A protein has these predicted regions:
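Non-catalytic accessory regions flanking glycosidase/transglycosidase catalytic cores in CAZymes
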Residues: 1-223, 229-237, 261-262, 266-303, ...
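Active-site His/acidic residue clusters
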Residues: 241-257
Length: 499
């Protein structure tokens, strides 16, 4: 089967905001405790954070991490997480029905973030709390000094402000499961007033307002419209959340789910632009897709979990090869929409629906989904080139005209590198792939990488990381175009030196 991608040097979708490759750490399960933080581990640093985990986070090259939630934040009292550790209270976390020790808080997480070269995307509690508490947290984190909260930060050991620049106004407030769930009208009013107050404290921050927690929510669409009508002038981004799964074991349908993500994004963009026109505004609201991933493997295990434990193993999906293929498709979809999606957070980062897994007192290991994310985060920099794709397609329940080839190309002018990311969705046929371009001169193929040939249900484990990429040498360059073969059910990365 033949397939083709064409690009032109000067036809671009957008520059890539590096925050597109963000992630998420929530006080949930073993994400924090026995995840990034395990003071008794042999690799633990002076603060108690595992150096082996830090190394894997650095490999992923994550520029931004959302924190501390998630559902958790809607019951969070941030003051419990600062000051001497021995004085911090243990509290019940109603979101996940566990016990929170508060041994990791604002200061510790900020230090960890600095160690792994990432920025903190801080969330405020608009479930059980409100404007005053959000202002005080921002003052504590970002104000230079000379006030009660900023001086308290100094007393707690941090002289200079943390300088967190991106803030989330609550989490999934449309969800009936959320502590302090609100209607769009209620949340829109609260978010607007909170945003106004926060920007009076620090006008350099950017704010993310809650969109729908899923495109399947009965209030989807109306929620976005009403919330934006209240907040449009005061916020910078609208959030989207979406998780995918394959409980019915329909691979063709599963690998087509990236089309659902694409439609979700385009629908939300339309709503943003409708409100812009309605308000007669010159301002453009962009998107923060700050929760996305595969999530369904652990549902049964989680339902049987005993409540009120400290750091129980919750949401520990073990990902397989087909999950890695879908993650590749979803990453390509985010790049295709990078003109409006400026922030995205793979949810989550460690142990909880995560690319990185740890054993208590033991090893770390990489899940199958680690690799596509690592490839795109490290090599998908610069600009996204507008794609023209020729590919046969298939139809499956819920989706018509699903292309066998899912692909995009990026160009990084700093290092003269053109990178092709491609998934072959076909379960049986190799794609004879041709890459045509205008405006570049090929110098050499830097590297061709593929994840291919695995059973779709194959997984990794601490004892054996079986599903991982290999260096291949199938691509050839002639007449300033590239040809290669993309194996059935494969994730492919081709890096080309150009001038």
């Amino acid at each position: 089967m033949k397939a083709k991608l064409r690009v032109q040097r000067h036809q671009k979708i957008s520059e890539i905001d590096e925050r597109l490759y963000g992630s998420f750490i929530e006080h949930l399960g073993r994400a924090v405790y026995n995840g990034i933080y395990e003071p008794t581990h042999e690799t633990a640093d002076a603060e108690g954070f595992r150096n082996d985990v830090k190394q894997l986070v650095k490999e992923l090259n994550v520029p931004l991490v959302r924190y501390p939630g998630g559902n958790f934040v809607s019951g969070y009292k941030w003051e419990d997480s600062v000051g001497p550790k021995e004085n911090r209270p243990r509290k019940v976390d109603l979101a996940w029905r566990t016990i929170e020790t508060n041994q990791v808080g604002v200061h510790e997480f900020a230090k960890w973030a600095k160690e792994v070269d990432t920025e903190v995307n801080m969330a405020v509690n608009l479930g059980t709390r409100g404007i005053q508490e959000a202002m005080e947290l921002l003052e504590y984190c970002n104000f230079e000094g000379g006030t009660y909260w900023s001086d308290l930060r100094k007393e707690h050991g941090t002289e200079k402000p943390f300088g967190f620049k991106t803030w989330c106004l609550g989490n999934e407030m449309d969800g009936p499961w959320q502590i302090g769930h609100k209607t769009a009208e209620e949340y829109g009013r609260l978010a607007a007033e909170t945003a106004k107050a926060m920007k009076l404290v620090d006008d350099s921050i950017e704010l993310v307002v809650c969109g729908s927690s899923s495109s399947k929510m009965p209030t989807f669409g109306d929620w976005e419209r009403v919330v934006l009508e209240h907040t449009y002038e005061y916020v910078d981004y609208l959030s989207l959340h979406c998780y995918y799964g394959n409980p019915e074991n329909n691979l063709g349908n599963y690998l087509a789910q990236s089309l659902d993500m694409d439609q979700f994004i385009k629908t939300v963009v339309s709503i943003c632009d409708y409100v812009k026109v309605k308000k007669g505004s010159d301002k453009q609201i962009n998107l923060s897709f700050d929760e996305w991933n595969v999530w369904y493997h652990s549902n049964e295990q989680d339902a049987a979990m005993e409540p009120w434990q400290i750091a129980p193993p919750l949401l520990e999906d073990i990902y397989n090869f087909e999950d890695a293929l879908l993650i590749g498709c979803l990453l390509i979809t985010l790049l295709k929409n990078s003109d409006r999606v400026k922030i995205a957070c793979l949810a989550q980062l460690v142990n909880v629906i995560a690319p990185i897994m740890t054993e208590n007192d033991g090893e770390t290991w990489k899940q199958t989904i680690f690799y596509p994310f690592m490839h795109v985060s490290n090599h998908g920099r610069g600009v996204v080139l507008t794609p023209s794709v020729e590919s046969d397609s298939y139809s499956v329940e819920g989706f018509k005209h699903v292309p066998y080839l899912e692909t995009i190309a990026t160009y990084n002018e700093e290092n003269n590198e053109l990178v092709i990311f491609a998934v072959n969705r076909s379960q049986e046929e190799t794609l004879e792939f041709v890459f045509e371009q205008e405006g570049f001169e090929f110098e050499s193929i830097i590297e061709e990488t593929a994840m291919e040939g695995f059973d779709v249900k194959a997984t990794n484990a601490a004892a054996a990381e079986v599903v991982k990429p290999s260096i291949v040498q199938k691509a050839t360059i002639a007449d300033n175009q590239l040809t290669t073969s993309l194996s059935p059910l494969s994730w492919n990365v081709i890096r080309i030196k150009v001038k």
